[in-house]
Design a protein with these regions (language model features):
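Conserved core of the PLP fold type I
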Residues: 52-73, 102-107
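Active-site pre-lysine segment of PLP-dependent enzymes
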Residues: 145-154, 158, 169-192
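Active-site phosphate-binding strand-loop segment of PLP-dependent enzymes
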Residues: 4, 110-167
Length: 338
């Protein structure tokens, strides 16, 4: 079976596992106050080029979104998201604040879409828009340009909105060949974002970076309140320490993107219809519904939706994948599609 299902289907990158094993017998302080977590935060701050932030490690994307959004918003305040935003479609109602959606453009929200929502919510008989949520990369593997992020940031600042970036796949966004955003840009662009480890070589864990320190007061209370605090916080600390020690975080993501580009080019070569342009490690194709079962017999992948009589299949490249695996997948798809 060729695995193109997702980028979190293995326990962890070998180097992460090696370091976890290395520190097996160490005695650590709990709750994220250990030496590994402290050092991991310093390594992240070095990447950001600033110490003016508050960093917390949480177990996964949904709990990170849940804790942060619940901490900073009042019950009557709402989040603006595109219709395909993860908090809107894949978090089982975890976000209890109302989500105001706008149609996505290639998986992304636009500054104009935000303005339209603001124009429709004008008084206390409606929820009050207070946050803009995006993910980078998006649910469709697309990425935001620096100009797009600057435009969103400008609208947020002009309208007193909190700008929050879901970075579950931030690694692939920052290492995309189409990208012009650096990690050091994020502190000036948004109020908070997180660095995804779960989908970038870690066993689990996300690093939430709160740039707007006015939002971080008593944040550890909220982490505990919502069940997001690790007793063994050093488990995340060791992993992020490893990911940011020698650029492993970027190395993993860059490989995934390169394989994604290769897979897309090979799919085009055999005349498979691409649903959306590939910018990172998620590739979406359109194929006759009757051929899905034959593909899934040999390739682990997900059906993402339908367009008329065609299925949208998502392929995701990962750090343990090799070009030879892609070549085998292409041969199979080509034979099925004849």
């Amino acid at each position: 079976m060729i695995n193109l299902r997702n980028d979190y289907c293995y326990i962890a990158h070998p180097k992460v596992l090696e370091n976890m094993q290395k520190y097996t017998s160490d005695i650590n302080v709990g709750y994220g106050l250990d030496k590994h977590s402290v050092r991991a935060k310093e390594l992240i701050r070095k990447e950001l080029g600033t110490r003016e932030n508050d960093i917390h490690f949480l177990v996964g994307g949904t709990i990170t979104n849940k804790v942060f959004i619940s901490h900073v918003l009042k019950p009557y305040e709402a989040v603006i998201s595109c219709d395909t935003g993860h908090i809107n479609v894949h978090e089982t109602g975890a976000i209890t604040n109302k989500i105001l959606t706008v149609p996505n453009v290639n998986g992304k929200i636009t500054s104009q879409g935000i303005k339209e929502v603001l124009s429709q919510h004008t008084d206390e008989h409606m929820v009050k828009p207070k946050m803009v949520y995006i993910s980078n990369s998006t649910e469709y593997g697309s990425i935001y340009t620096l100009k797009e992020l600057q435009e969103i940031s400008k609208v947020c600042k002009e309208n007193n909105l909190i700008f929050f970036i879901d970075g579950a796949r931030l690694g692939t966004a920052l290492t995309s060949s189409y990208n012009d955003v650096e990690m050091k840009d994020l502190p000036t662009l948004c109020d908070a974002f997180y660095i995804g480890g779960t989908k970038n070589g870690a066993i689990l864990g996300e690093a939430l970076v709160i740039n707007n320190l006015e939002l971080s007061k008593d944040f550890r209370y909220s982490i505990k309140h919502y069940g997001g605090m690790y007793s063994k916080g050093f488990v995340a600390g060791i992993q992020f320490e490893t990911l940011f020690e020698n650029n492993l975080f970027y190395e993993i993501a860059r490989k995934e993107n390169e394989l994604g580009q290769y897979l897309e080019s090979e799919l085009k070569r055999i005349n498979i219809e691409i649903y959306m342009k590939t910018e990172t490690n998620q590739i979406f194709i359109l194929i006759d519904e009757t051929k899905v079962d034959d593909i899934q017999k040999e390739i682990s992948c997900e059906v993402f939706g339908k367009v008329e009589n065609k299925a949208i299949i998502r392929f995701v490249t990962h750090y343990l994948l090799e070009k030879e695996d892609i070549d085998s997948a292409i041969c199979l798809i080509e034979s099925v599609n004849k």
